[in-house]
Amino acid sequence: MAAVSKTKRTRRRKERKNIERGCAHIKSTFNNSIVTLTDTAGNALSWASAGGLGFRGSRKSTPFAAQMAAETAAKAAMEHGLKSVEVYVKGPGSGREAAIRSLQAAGLEVTLIKDVTPIPHNGCRPPKRRRV
């Protein structure tokens, strides 16, 4: 029987980048909110989503869930030295303003807020209206 060599895979520790200015991309849909903090080139420093924090079902789409996601992502990015962000908001969800306020409350200086929601030039057919 051949001896199987067990090579231990060492996980590289995340090095602390020293980035002071960056971007916050907030994607707020009807079902979830995702907050990604990047440097100015677009390389992700940290991200968090409402679903990833344990919110499930209808609680996932609340402003409070978006606030918690933004707070979690901001704390992780501030470990890399992030101080000020430009905020780009995408989507029609309820967590847009809550996420921006949460970034400010976490200690990040918001220098710009821009809505980058994609608007179709009569592209795909929208989902049918709900009859409740």
UniProtKB/Swiss-Prot annotation:
GO MF: rRNA binding; structural constituent of ribosome
HAMAP family: Ribosomal_uS11 (MF_01310)
SUPFAM superfamilies: Translational machinery components (SSF53137)
Record flagged with keyword rRNA-binding: yes
Organism: Clostridium tetani (strain Massachusetts / E88)
Pfam families in the cross-refs: Ribosomal_S11
Chain's role: Located on the platform of the 30S subunit, it bridges several disparate RNA helices of the 16S rRNA. Forms part of the Shine-Dalgarno cleft in the 70S ribosome.
Superkingdom in the source lineage: Bacteria
Cross-referenced PROSITE patterns: RIBOSOMAL_S11
GO CC, alphabetical: ribonucleoprotein complex; ribosome
Subunit description: Part of the 30S ribosomal subunit. Interacts with proteins S7 and S18. Binds to IF-3.
Family as reported in the entry's similarity comment: Belongs to the universal ribosomal protein uS11 family.
Keywords: Ribonucleoprotein, Ribosomal protein, RNA-binding, rRNA-binding
GO annotation terms (biological process): translation
Full protein name: Small ribosomal subunit protein uS11
NAD among keywords: no
